[in-house]
Amino acid sequence: MTSTKEIKQLQKAKSKAQSSNNLKEEASLCNQLGEVYAKTGDYQAAIEEHRQELALSEILHDVIGSAVANRKIGECYAELGNIEAALKHQRLHLNLARSVHDAAEEQRALATIGRTYLFLFDSDQSANSLKHAEDAFKRSLAIVDERLEGTVSPREISEMKARLLLNLGCVYDGMKEPQRCSDLIRQSIYIAEKNNLLEDLYRANFNLGSIHFRNGQHSRAMRCFEQSKECARKMKDKFSESECFHSIGKILLHLGDFSAARRSLKKAFCLGSQQPSDREAVKKDFRHAIRGCQLEQTAAEVTQKFSHEALDLSEQLGDLYCKVGCYSKALEAYQTQLACAEALAKPARELAVIHVSLAATYTDLRQHHRAVEHYRQELQLRKGNPKEECETWLNMAVCQEEMCQSMETLDHCFTSALNCAEKSGLNKLQRRVLRVWLQAQRRCGSSQCDDTEARLMELCERDGLSLDQSEDEDEEDEVDNSEPLEDSDIQYSESDDEDLEGYDKMVTGRRKTQRWNRRNEKGETVLHRACIEGNLKQVQYLIEQGHPVNVRDYCGWTPLHESCNYGHQEIVAFLLDRGANVNDPGGRECGGITPLHDTLSCGHFSVARLLVLRGASVTVRNSKGHTPLDTLRQWFKTYSGQLDPETKQECLETEKLIKRALSGDVSVVCAAPRQQKELQDSQLFDAEYSEPLLRESPPSPPPITRPAATVPTSKDSAPKHRSTSASTRRPRGMEVDVLYGDDSSSSDNPDSDCSLSPLRPVRSRPRSPPAQSPQEVPSSQELPSVYGIKETTVPPQSESGRLEYQKAMQNLGSAKSRLFSQSLSDPAFTSTPAVSANSRAALVPEDQYLADDWLEDDLIDMQPKKKRRVSEHNATRETTSRSQNNSSTIAEVPPRVQSCSSRGSLSLKKGSNKPRQVKMNQLPGMVMLGRREVSRSQSPIMTQESDHIQEPAPPSHQAMPPASFQNRAAHVPAPIRMRVKVQDNVFLIPVPHSEADSCTVAWLCDQAAQRYYQMCGLLPRLSLQKEGALLLPTDPLLAVLHTNEEVLAEVCSWDLPPLPERYRKACESLGVEENRRVSRVCEVQDSSSCVSVCGLSLSPASLNPLLRALKLQASLTELRISANRLNDELLPEMMAAAATMPRLRVLDISANQITGEGLRKASDAFETRSQAAFPCLEELNLSMNPLGDGWTQALASLLSSCPLLSSLSLQACGLSARFLQQHRLLLANAMASTGNMRSVCLSHNALGSTGFELVLKTLPMHCLTHLELSAVCRGPSDQPSMEILTKLLAQGDCPLTHLNLSGNGLTDHSVLLLARCLPVCPSLVSLDLSANPLVTSTGLHSLLNGLVEARRPLGHLNLQGCQVSGPLAEDCLDSLSDHIRDLRLCSQSLNKLDQDALQQSWKRRTEAVHIFSRNSKCMLSISSPSH
């Protein structure tokens, strides 16, 4: 229910209570009304309601009611900033609660008073306010602890405690006591979590996150905000969730991650904010994030390191980084700007500005000495400009003061500043210097204050000002130079819709971007199609509904390009009014053609004049170097022989207007004023849905060139008029029209439906014979006035009849022959060198534009005869891309179903279908490969006149005998299949016969990628190679490959969306339900270097999609999946996923029910690899898995795949001596081959004495530093043999530092053998002999004697669980403290006197001593205590 509706209902109920004289009900309704008003921010109205509640409660003698009313009034006053009035009413609340001995209400009163003092601290920053707040909160907490037990519910008590602890934490935050603050807030979080108090948990996490953010602890802040966001989501509180997204976005902005910040801030904006100020703050940060993404993307596309473009981008990025507080990246940007400026030899004035930016940024980073360096460099560059020098000296003085420099140093800076100010002659500047100087002197307690103040007073009196009179500074606050952001301009992406799940009924005004992102095969949106078809109403509707104006198709054309190309003047004007880029050069395939170039190339002069008057550049050049004037002259030169006087006059007027614009005599007409917006819709339209200016690889058919203007067939065929308005509007296509390219509706029917068909293929105008060889067009300075001269076209006399005949035949032939002949002809006129044969023009002449009639029908004898003949009407119809031909053309080329566009004679005069240019991507049937053109087959065309599919009728001279015809028709073609090898997988991909001719290499890449994704869970971007040669994506498949031929696919990159999205897709692909805990882990640990799902007991079905999602997580260094149910079947999948993580250092799969069989399966997958599967893995934990014996070879194979492995843990894996009786040497070689193994843990495996001996023979003792062999004996009679161990330790080069032999039934004799090794094994610093009850004081004496002989201390000795008893000799006690730094004993065998003697001997040490003695433990340490 909305607040307005709730208020109306409460007011209605209040009126009813008043009419019935129900005072108690009326007071209750006043209370509710006041709360609603306060929630909406109308605190004055809330105060009035609570005043009425107070009056009614006093009449009713309701003390608690009066107390509550006073509390509410006080809270409203506090929100309004009237602290005095707030405290007055809150103290009344406290007194009333005490008068009736209501402990709960007294507690609330004290908490409210404390909160009010916190409000006061925000404004006055007074320690006294904090002290009052602390006192109130502590007294309130004491009441909760002492007086409320049993009187209120436990949940309420927990709620009160959580809130009071949070408030106290905020108090100590203000007192600058971070540890107490953190402890209290964490206590609040714990209580809230334990009792499921979502609102309090949200508030505590949010406050703690804000504190971490303020202290620069970004990762902790992010974690807190994520937790508070989850609470808000559970509470279905969209405003609170929006606040969390906003805070996360601000952190990401502060880190300079604009892309991630934009995603978070977009979610915040979509969810909305309760207060207008909060919404404006979100919009401001959102704008910064969008701008940052755009600048970073543009900067990534800059190819030249030192260029003007790089210079401008660096400055903009630096300024933006400063705005969002990311000063470290701002420094990098400004330093790049400085390097560019110096390389480009920029003047000193510009270099000085950059030094100012660097100095200010260093000041923000508190690196004042670096700031002073840049100010000094600025000073050198400002020579001769006293005003700027003065500003620099003042800035230097501020930095020097921050550096705590002496007053003499500051006086030097201020004196220099004052001298510069006097040179400038600006009294205002002199007064400013003196004011700042005086303030600095007062802060430092200088004795010169009086002199400076006298000089300032003298200067003020001279100008008629008082000393205390403030002056406006010259500097103005920085104003954001963007327009106000309108909510309707925001474009939501699909991911945002998913993030808003659960709020579909709560969030108003949400729009789906899918409706604007639907494109046809050419990448055209619905707006493109509306502009092409001239449907002004549809264009207006789409723009009003929020369709982006500057969206591009796959080639790069915008809707403005299309409307200019088709000459729709009203649409052009409307698009310009709505922010269309009038100078957009198009995409990479568009040849730098602006809308003005485009419309001039088509002869739409009225549109061209409109563009010029609306600010279109007349100096910009396309990729051929042509200006708009060059384009106009080229068009005139091409068609001058067919123009009527009226058209020539229009051409002349357009030329004059362009020349006036070149001289600056044209005043630009601005668009009609509209409500300004902060962000253009194209800015907020996601880049993943709106095609970028430069596209690496279009996702659909490759860009194809636009047809250029048509050449009239002959001068005699020109009609009397030429129209500049659209004449080819078409009705909306039905589904069959879209699929089969039906274009049979009349374009001349004025009553036809003009609504939009977003997937209709475009039609070109009728084609004419090719133009004559163009002559060189005069330059801009020497254009003759030929527009009024009537010219005639005379064919060249030197051309023989044979050449004329060949040209005619080429024009009538197939697309292949026409284009091939054209590629051999002379290049068209250009003011720049001719383009190579392999290059493609963005505009293609319409006589080469084939539209839907691109198929060369050379399989006519394979087509069966139709039972019904094609109608006479259809047989005589022309395609949209063919010109009028004589009867020989119809006899040679089979007729097709074509458009019923007008067959009137071609013309360039008004009232006719004028020639126009068609886009590259509107050639649906061919791909240009240098000079070779491959024609593709096309789906049959359906007409509205007949329900039957019309096929071309075979010509009479190729008719086949009926029997032969039937045999061919009955023949079933062999299947077409391609074999694609992607890494270690080979896919057999069938090619449908119906699409075989149209399939390209890109299609095959896509099919292979989808199959690889289904198998491995990764979506690659592939390129194909055949015998070492790279296949282009645009290559026709059957032209480069044969059926059953195998090609090698190389992975160019991987499609890796954020981890939560990958997990969601993996669940969909595997058909399993998402696990909420795993989804939460993915969200929290997406950008983390560690992913941990330990202890979740996840089933294989829940783990499988997670493992798929984690593949190729390049930043991952730690993967911990312990205590789950991975099992043998899923282990190979997990290992395969881990092998795709190039930086993985730690892999923990302990306690996952893995057996030796699973390990064998996993190792088999890596045997065939030529490179190590885990090149960076350092730690592998397989503990607590029932591996058993018999998999030594598999372990050796796995270790061979980890060349950097240094730590291996096989604790409690059910191993015995048989584990090493086979393939032991193989395992030993795998461990020793790399020389990196440092730590091995085989504890809690029943190895016995035999296994113990085999382990020591297998392990690489020459490099091992940590060895854990605790509890490996099988019984009291099977003790491990110490002789081999002592022999290894006695070798001089043994690097072992930590040895654990606990729980192995060792005796004093075993310890004696170890003690003899101590003098010859100096590296051993830690020895764990705990849980060996047969070790007594004798063993301890042996160790001490060995240490005395070694003349070195032992860092750690653990004898807990051993029978070390007293009495201990005096020399033994002294030796203990001298030679053991950390000793751990079992005190059960030591009496009180022995323990005291031991502690006293330890305390005689001069170093810091830590002693812990409790129950059966006695721990003595010289260094810091071990935890």
Swiss-Prot record:
Compositional bias ranges of the Basic and acidic residues kind: 871-880
Stretches with biased composition (Low complexity): 10-21, 742-761, 899-910
Subcellular location: Nucleus; Chromosome; Cytoplasm
GO terms under biological process: double-strand break repair via homologous recombination; replication fork processing
One Pfam family recorded for the sequence: TPR_12
Keyword DNA repair carried by entry: yes
UniProt keyword Nucleus, yes or no: yes
Biased composition (Acidic residues): 469-501
Positions of LRR repeats: 1113-1137, 1141-1168, 1174-1197, 1234-1258, 1293-1316, 1321-1346, 1377-1400
Sorted UniProt keywords: ANK repeat, Chromatin regulator, Chromosome, Cytoplasm, DNA damage, DNA repair, Leucine-rich repeat, Nucleus, Repeat, TPR repeat
Major localisation: nucleus
Swiss-Prot/TrEMBL ANK repeat ranges: 522-551, 555-584, 591-620
TPR repeats: 27-60, 67-100, 107-147, 162-195, 202-235, 242-275, 311-344, 352-385
Molecular function GO labels: histone binding; histone reader activity
Function: Component of the MMS22L-TONSL complex, a complex that promotes homologous recombination-mediated repair of double-strand breaks (DSBs) at stalled or collapsed replication forks. The MMS22L-TONSL complex is required to maintain genome integrity during DNA replication. It mediates the assembly of RAD51 filaments on single-stranded DNA (ssDNA): the MMS22L-TONSL complex is recruited to DSBs following histone replacement by histone chaperones and eviction of the replication protein A complex (RPA/RP-A) from DSBs.
PANTHER family the record matches: TONSOKU-LIKE PROTEIN
Family, similarity comment: Belongs to the Tonsoku family.
Description of how the protein assembles with itself and partners: Component of the MMS22L-TONSL complex. Binds histones, with a strong preference for histone H3.1 (histones H3.1 and H3-4/H3.1t).
Name listed for the protein in its UniProt record: Tonsoku-like protein
Organism: Danio rerio (Zebrafish)
